[in-house]
C-alpha cells in the first residue's frame, strides 16, 4: 500500500494528482502546519521535514520528481515517453527538472522576501519594502518572466509539456505555475500556459485530487480566468488625464 504523507498547501498535491491518474490504491495522511512549518510528527518521517513524503512497501521516498519517477516506473510506464521516443523523452526530462531547478527558485525567493517585509518591525518596514522591491524588480521578476516566456513558447507547439501526451511532467510543473498565478500570469497574456492550465485542470484525476487534499493548490489552479487580466488598481491609484 502506498502512503502519502500530505502537508497542507504544499508540493505534495502533485503527487495526489499523479496517484489518481495511475488509479492505484493509496492512503493519505494529512498534516497541518505549525507556525507555517511541518509539525514534529512529519519531521520524524524524514529529518528534512519537506513535503511530499511517500512510503511504498516500507521504503520512504522524498523529492517530488523522484517520487513521480518511482510511481511511473512501478505503476504506470505510459505516463513517461518510451526510450524510442527520443524527442518526447528529452522534453519530459527537461521539464521534470525545470520545475524546481529553474522556475521555482525565483518565485520562492520573492515569497521569502515578502515574508521578511511582513516580519519587519513596522517602523522599519517601509525601508525594507523598498529594498525588497528593488531586488524583485531588477532581478527576480525579470528572471521569472524570462522563465514563463520560455514555458509559454514551448507550449505554443506542444499540447502538454512532453509533447502531445499527458505525462508526469505535467503534474510536476503545476506547482510553480500555480505559485506564479497571482503576481506574474496576470501581467502578460501567456495564452499557451493558460490553455494548458484549462486542459489539465479538466482532467478527472486533477479534480478528484483537488477535492481530496482540500487546499487551494489545485482548486485555484483551475481558476485560470481569475488571472487572465492585470488586476485593477484601487481608485486612489488610478491616474486621471483630466
UniProtKB/Swiss-Prot annotation:
Residue ranges constituting the GST C-terminal domain according to the UniProt record: 85-234
CDD domains the UniProt entry points to: GST_N_GTT1_like
Enzyme class, spelled out: transferase
A Pfam family assignment: GST_C
Localization (cell): Cytoplasm
Phosphoserine sites (modified residues): 228
A single Gene Ontology CC term: cytoplasm
Catalytic activity: RX + glutathione = an S-substituted glutathione + a halide anion + H(+)
Superkingdom of the source species: Eukaryota
GO biological process, one term: glutathione metabolic process
Keyword tags: Cytoplasm, Phosphoprotein, Transferase
E.C. numbers: 2.5.1.18
Gene Ontology molecular function: any one: glutathione transferase activity
Upregulation: By heavy metals such as cadmium and mercury.
Domain GST N-terminal per the UniProt entry, residue ranges: 1-79
Modified residues (Phosphothreonine): 232
Oligomeric and partner information: Interacts with sad1.
Family: Belongs to the GST superfamily.
PANTHER family to which the protein is assigned, alphabetical: GLUTATHIONE S-TRANSFERASE 1 (PTHR44051:SF9), GLUTATHIONE S-TRANSFERASE-RELATED (PTHR44051)
Entry function: May have a role in the detoxification of various heavy metals.
Protein name per UniProt: Glutathione S-transferase 3
